[in-house]
């Protein structure tokens, strides 16, 4: 994590002030009436995905009483370990106690739950952000039959499996997988080694800018994917049970940050660039402008988990009962409280 410069601090602080969580705003008074967090050090994952935007608002987290905010790099080794366990890569970091909170793709969370990982989902963060790209002659999911599909993690195969099963394909025999965490699927596509691949921000914006292939399915616009959360916020189950005040305070800061992503995308994009999370302001702004961060008050996160869990179960990718997994690995108390407190 780069050292925070004065300019970065001022940008972060200005955005924090815009939320009303600092100073003597209404939320500042609410914070003062609550007990302090049981722990003041918290850890998040750090990766290149624009989806992490709500996690980087250090001043919002500091306003909640956290004095030591750490970011742990997500690496290729994390992906390989998760692949071996049939778990979601970032959720696997939570399960191993390497981070306290992280955003993770909903199907990956279900895989980690099924693998026995001690993760607890707290909230949805935003709706769809990924798109499936393919060669020009591939016009639909059904056209993937007999093709080669690239992913950088085995967990991505789970998503494509449930998507293609809806159109009658059996991914185990109808197309060939190429999965390598050390390679970018986009590069393999350019080299002609694969016929289709998934892209998420910021790679998604680069694919568009370079006019590489075309969109087969977009979770941003195409149902049912556009109607469900893409990334969700999760914590270690032990953390949520041991530190309920800290858990609520972290969630509040991140949901306020999500509001800022929706209302101030230009300022948030600038912050991400200044803090070294991404290099391209234009790609980041495009992603923040498209991704729906404004839905956490209205969309039910449990609906998303149940939708993906049922499809994963039908595909034989998870063994446990979807209802049991959701009952054991979710805690909506904090979200319900914050929906009442942070009315739009």
Where are these regions (language model features)?
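N-terminal export signals
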Residues: 2, 8-29
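Secondary-structure end/capping motifs
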Residues: 242-320
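A general structural motif at alpha-helix termini
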Residues: 13, 17, 126, 148, ...
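Short, glycine-/small- and polar/acidic-enriched structural segments
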Residues: 33-172, 176-181, 188, 195-201, ...
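Solvent-exposed, polar/charged alpha-helical surfaces in well-ordered, non-transmembrane soluble domains
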Residues: 92, 142, 158-162, 187, ...
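Short, solvent-exposed loop/beta-turn-alpha elements that line the ligand-binding surface or hinge
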Residues: 62-66, 221-226, 292-301
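Conserved C-terminal helix/tail region of periplasmic/extracytoplasmic solute-binding proteins
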Residues: 313-344
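Pocket-lining segment of extracytoplasmic ligand-binding domains
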Residues: 107, 184-274
